[in-house]
Amino acid sequence: MSGILLSNPVNAIPLMNRIRKIHFVGIGGTGMCGIAEILAHEGYCITGSDIVYSSTTRHLFELGVKIFIGHKYSNINNANVIVVSSAIHPNNPEILAAKQARIPVIKRAEMLSELMRFRHGIAISGTHGKTTTTTMIVNIYTAAGLDPTFINGGIVKSEGVHARLGYSRYLIVEADESDNSFLHLHPMVEVITNIDTDHIHEYQGNFEYLKKAFIDFLHNLPFYGYAIVCIDDPVICEILPKIKRKIITYGFNKNANLHIFNYRQHIEKSSFTVSRFNQTKLQVTLNAPGCHNALNATAAIAVATEEGISDKIILKTMLDFQGTHRRFENLGYYSLNKINDQTGEILLIDDYGHHPAELHATIVAIRTGWPDRRLVMVFQPHRYTRIKELYYDFIDVLSNVDILLILHVYSAGEPPILGADSQSLCHAIREFGKINPTFISNTKMLSGALFRLLRNNDLLLIQGAGTIGEVVRRLIVKND
């Protein structure tokens, strides 16, 4: 398990020594800021632009990264390469300026692949659960003293950052399938948590193209590498016969190489047993609720088992798991008298999930762990295309809460789509007949709705991938 790395692996690429200044367009994005941070720590001159200041841009600024707010031709001055987020339009002035100056413009995954080139890469992908699974693997490797470099899509709470430069050969990354760019990566180990209908517009509206992308990604493994996949997922089972690499399976399915059974949830903890081929069973206590997190944990256990990390370290890490920022994050109890002058308290949980399957998993975990609490959800839909593609799934799953407040769609740069807006979704849920949702048009209206609706013993769930977490935290947490 030796992980000693004696030199900077990027500088081991001779031509990369010619690259000194790297400019990121959309540097505040979760997929961008981690790569920028690692390169800054490796000694590169990093600059970046975004449309707003955020906690991530502030963090990078404190590391010495020059941040520009707004996109202008002059921002790319003297850059050797431009790294772009998938959310950036091709007509962005910085991209146009780079092309005119014949400066290379690359996707973030292409830069990530350069970071991985001389490292032992572990890439975690899948529609749901990849950020939490990445965090778990990072925690286990760190506890084992393997000092990995990591780049995650969310803040690893035990580390307080999205990314960290380690000095071993290990690089643990979240591999984003949303725009097909994960095919730039060539790791030694891959984890596929599941394959579901999301970002289909990026695959010409054809789910078969998304499945083909995962097949190609698995074949990016070298012949001596291996993949860890969840066979509870029917799409993964469908593509497995086409994969010509070593496969290790996990899941509640009895045929899995790592089989989960005896699952129990104890409020916000869970316990379960994992049987492993030719190895002792593990009795796991995980500091996170939900069957979905048991699956995430077992994927991490599979990686650690293959690496030869001791069971003692694995089990201790699961017991002490602190989680990931905004992934079923328990923010604690807040007094109602600071919100609406009533007596009592509410429990506040913040979750990034924005796909119907993720919402379903969160709702089930809450109903199991806190069955006597009224569930009040503040939901901010994310992307018009997602609402359009999964419209009826959203109607079904959102009808399973007690009180529902729906904010405007967080567009992530997309133009509006007729009938895929929050007002239309709200109307459709009301017509479905199980609950009567409220459309929230602004922060003042949200404050008033919370003042009017919250009562003692409620569980308030902040749900969505946009700005909703910061908005509700300001309204609730600042008053406590």
From Swiss-Prot:
Keywords: ATP-binding, Cell cycle, Cell division, Cell shape, Cell wall biogenesis/degradation, Cytoplasm, Ligase, Nucleotide-binding, Peptidoglycan synthesis. GO terms for cellular component: cytoplasm. It comes from the Bacteria. One of its GO terms (molecular function) is ATP binding. Pathway: Cell wall biogenesis; peptidoglycan biosynthesis. InterPro entries: Mur-like_cat_sf (IPR036565), Mur_ligase_C (IPR004101), Mur_ligase_C_dom_sf (IPR036615), Mur_ligase_cen (IPR013221), Mur_ligase_N (IPR000713), MurCDEF_pg_biosynth (IPR050061), UDP-N-AcMur_Ala_ligase_MurC (IPR005758). Pfam families: Mur_ligase, Mur_ligase_C, Mur_ligase_M. It is found in: Cytoplasm. It catalyses: UDP-N-acetyl-alpha-D-muramate + L-alanine + ATP = UDP-N-acetyl-alpha-D-muramoyl-L-alanine + ADP + phosphate + H(+). ATP binds at residues 126-132. One of its GO terms (biological process) is cell division. PANTHER family: UDP-N-ACETYLMURAMATE--L-ALANINE LIGASE, UDP-N-ACETYLMURAMATE--L-ALANINE LIGASE-RELATED. This is UDP-N-acetylmuramate--L-alanine ligase.
